Amino acid sequence: MKEEKKLLLREVEEKITASQGFILLRYLGFTAAHSRSFRNNLSGVSAEFEVLKKKIFFKALETSGVEMDPEDGEGHLGVVFAYGDPVSAAKQVLDFNKQHNDSLVFLAGRIDNASLSGREVEAVAKLPSMKELRQQVVGLIAAPMSQVAGIMNSVLSGVISCVDQKAEKTQE
């Protein structure tokens, strides 16, 4: 293996071990402007996009001890390395894809040491974020409490109304 390829292989291995997960993409009709915009969007969620040869990427996976079936075909592969939350990176890819006429195709991914198919990665990206889930839980907890407060308020209002009516009758 040539020195340049060895260096690239080592660099990809480091990215695999440093990342919390990664997403494999096929990119269709991706212009330089799309690529730049996509990379900027990913940097907001601590992720980066790399275009790599499939052979080098899967060799790096193998030497890093990560098991994943190589995709069919030759050529290049788009890889999103997520250094933060991999689900946020997947959501960012999905959002970008919606805005740019499905120019990206999910092939596979690895999140929380689990290998996922392209469909599974896309399904994970469609799930609510942790922030949204927390808001839903708080809403579920707060709703019964507000109902109890409303009931207590109406009961107390009824008691006060009865006391007021009784006081008016005794004054007459």
Swiss-Prot record:
GO terms for cellular component: large ribosomal subunit. GO terms for biological process: translation. Keywords: Ribonucleoprotein, Ribosomal protein, RNA-binding, rRNA-binding. It comes from the Bacteria. GO terms for molecular function: large ribosomal subunit rRNA binding; structural constituent of ribosome. Pfam families: Ribosomal_L10. Forms part of the ribosomal stalk, playing a central role in the interaction of the ribosome with GTP-bound translation factors. Belongs to the universal ribosomal protein uL10 family. Part of the ribosomal stalk of the 50S ribosomal subunit. The N-terminus interacts with L11 and the large rRNA to form the base of the stalk. The C-terminus forms an elongated spine to which L12 dimers bind in a sequential fashion forming a multimeric L10(L12)X complex. NCBIfam families: PRK00099.1-1. This is Large ribosomal subunit protein uL10. It comes from Chlamydia trachomatis serovar A (strain ATCC VR-571B / DSM 19440 / HAR-13). The lineage of its organism: Bacteria, Pseudomonadati, Chlamydiota, Chlamydiia, Chlamydiales.
